[in-house]
């Protein structure tokens, strides 16, 4: 999965997919009542990234729905996964469940079209703080009470705080999560980060007792760091330059081993070689 980073304006969806992304990451900010409000990152952000683009969250969802609904004039067949980077740092811990409920209702109405031929992309809820695990339970409760528990089949999870792998496993246990787990690891592209924790995550993914289904690394903009991440065995790379990742995947060393994921590749299944 080539994951376009900080795609917060509807116009950027076309831009990133046309550069080779089959997945996008979108920032979601919340108001003081835990309503998802804007798709907005804000400063500071990555070196060379554009961090001031934004939309109202529900408007962004409508644009995203068009981009992922077959038959729509804006449809991109390649766009199969969306990571919502949930900026829950502005919330009190006891608001996490409410944030999850409100997020689910927004998605149900504006993205899934109330379960009636809505957008088809898989969705990852990426949460920066393990203490906010109730966002997941609130999300699930809301979809169930709205009569659409089947949409949870399209939803996966990520804790993005680079926490100890054992602590992450524990948070999932508390949230009642037993699958659909992506594990991110990374740092802003302005800084260097080793691949030690990525290797631990990959080892967990590949062990029979692990909780992780997919591992992605962020934010990678250079060819050599792309090669290093692929050599470590990641499933996804988040980038400001999807074309760079696509180029490296075309190199002979990687062409035989990796391919770009399509809609038929289940993002919740661990890839077995």
Swiss-Prot record:
GO terms for molecular function: lyase activity; metal ion binding; phosphoric diester hydrolase activity; toxin activity. Binds 1 Mg(2+) ion per subunit. CDD domains: GDPD_like_SMaseD_PLD. Disulfide bonds join 45-51, 47-190. Mg(2+) binds at residues 25, 27, 85. GO terms for biological process: killing of cells of another organism; lipid catabolic process. InterPro entries: PLC-like_Pdiesterase_TIM-brl. Its main location: secreted. It catalyses: an N-(acyl)-sphingosylphosphocholine = an N-(acyl)-sphingosyl-1,3-cyclic phosphate + choline; an N-(acyl)-sphingosylphosphoethanolamine = an N-(acyl)-sphingosyl-1,3-cyclic phosphate + ethanolamine; a 1-acyl-sn-glycero-3-phosphocholine = a 1-acyl-sn-glycero-2,3-cyclic phosphate + choline; a 1-acyl-sn-glycero-3-phosphoethanolamine = a 1-acyl-sn-glycero-2,3-cyclic phosphate + ethanolamine. Belongs to the arthropod phospholipase D family. Class II subfamily. This is Dermonecrotic toxin LapSicTox-alphaIB1ai.
């Amino acid at each position: 999965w080539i994951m376009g980073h900080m795609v917060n304006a509807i116009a950027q969806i076309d831009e990133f997919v046309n550069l080779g992304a089959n997945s996008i990451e979108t920032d979601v900010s919340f108001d003081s009542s835990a309503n998802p409000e804007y798709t907005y990152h804000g400063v500071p952000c990555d070196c060379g990234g554009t961090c001031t683009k934004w939309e109202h969250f529900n408007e962004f969802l409508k644009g995203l729905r068009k981009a992922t609904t077959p038959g729509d004039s804006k449809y991109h067949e390649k766009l199969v996964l969306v990571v919502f980077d949930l900026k829950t740092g502005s919330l009190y811990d006891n608001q996490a469940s409410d944030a999850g409920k409100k997020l689910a209702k927004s998605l149900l109405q504006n993205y899934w079209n109330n379960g009636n031929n809505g957008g088809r992309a898989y969705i990852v809820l990426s949460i920066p703080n393990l203490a906010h695990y109730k966002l997941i339970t609130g999300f699930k409760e809301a979809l169930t009470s709205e009569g659409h528990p089947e949409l949870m089949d399209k939803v996966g999870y990520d804790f993005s705080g680079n926490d100890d792998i054992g602590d992450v496993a524990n948070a999932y246990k508390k949230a009642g999560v037993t699958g659909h787990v992506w594990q991110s690891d990374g740092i802003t592209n302005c800084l260097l980060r080793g691949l030690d924790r990525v290797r631990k995550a990959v080892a967990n993914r590949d062990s029979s007792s692990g909780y992780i289904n997919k591992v992605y690394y962020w934010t990678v903009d250079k060819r050599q760091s792309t090669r290093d991440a692929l050599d470590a065995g990641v499933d996804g790379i988040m980038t400001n330059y999807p074309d760079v990742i696509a180029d490296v995947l075309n190199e002979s060393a990687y062409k035989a081993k990796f391919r770009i994921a399509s809609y038929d590749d289940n993002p919740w299944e661990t890839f077995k070689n």
